[in-house]
A protein has these predicted regions:
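A short glycine-centered flexible hinge/capping loop motif at secondary-structure junctions
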Residues: 101-108
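Active-site entrance/lid segments in N-terminal catalytic domains of soluble metabolic enzymes
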Residues: 1-95
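Conserved active-site-proximal phosphate/metal-binding subdomains
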Residues: 60-77, 87-97, 109-260
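Generic beta-sheet signal
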Residues: 28, 56, 103, 128-129
Length: 260
């Protein structure tokens, strides 16, 4: 193993572990601020094995994205100024020649010509994520390969349906649309009357009582009248109204996925 990449949060210890084994490490960050925190707390101690820094753009990259509370998921930012800020920070701590790997939205290198051999950005590389899925060696179904080559604006959605609660990009499939519709049938609730949560509703076959905002009671009653009679609780103190059949399917999926 010559090198490892690591993201999924703030991998403070990856530099220490990689250096101990003589392996280069390539942390994944989504902003200069994230790298600054990693550098100050840990990476300055293992700079000799820092092979590069992967910048994973919060709006262009697929999968989970490192959006902070200071960034609007619905207002994408140009990646060039963000990567330039990262380079300036790296140069200030002696990493002017350490490569930055641009990840997210990279399909054709011709789209990035102004990045290559740019003295302000310094050494730059590019990470392909989706494109290798189209190769002959890729085991995914041909139907998915065809879908990837025909995507248009609006076919990729930045959403929060992941169990992690983080923003992530996904192709706007029928399943994502189903999750959107479910999410629209969601209200906050309390087990007992509290503050403005004074409107009582009874849900499920046992008529379990819960308290919601008065405006939400009217919505909930309409959803239940339309057949969405089961209220599934979420960790965010909300309930999602679904049909009895949907509830059974969700519970089965949860049981089948236990430990997976």
């Amino acid at each position: 193993i010559d090198g490892i990449t690591c993201g999924a949060g703030m991998p403070y210890r990856v530099g220490e572990i990689a250096t101990r084994h003589g392996v280069y490490y390539y942390p994944i960050v989504s902003s200069a601020r994230a790298f600054r925190a990693l550098w100050k707390r840990a990476f300055h101690k293992q700079s000799e094995m820092l092979g590069g820094v992967v910048y994973e753009d919060p709006w262009l990259a697929g999968g989970h994205n490192g959006l902070s509370n200071a960034e609007d998921p619905r207002v994408p930012q140009d990646p060039f100024p963000r990567v330039l800020e990262l380079r300036k920070l790296m140069a200030s701590v002696g990493l002017a020649e350490t490569p930055i790997v641009m990840a997210g939205g990279v399909w054709y290198l011709r789209d990035w010509e102004d990045w290559i051999d740019n003295p302000d950005l310094g050494p730059i590389a590019f990470q392909y994520g989706s494109r290798p899925l189209l190769t002959q060696e890729s085991p995914i179904p041909q139907e998915w390969k065809d879908r990837l080559t025909t995507l248009t604006d609006g076919d990729v959605l930045l959403q929060k349906f992941s169990p992690t609660g983080f923003w992530s990009s996904a192709i706007y499939t029928d399943y994502i649309q189903l999750l959107e519709r479910r999410s629209e049938r969601q209200v906050a609730y309390r087990r007992k009357p509290e503050d403005d949560f004074i409107a009582s509703i009874k849900v499920g076959p046992r008529g379990r009582e819960m308290f919601v905002l008065p405006d939400d009671k009217e919505k909930a009653e309409k959803w239940m009248a339309a057949g969405h009679t089961d209220a599934l609780r979420t960790p965010d103190d909300t309930v999602v109204f679904v049909s009895t059949e949907e509830a059974a399917e969700i519970h089965k999926d949860q049981v089948d996925c236990m430990g997976c």
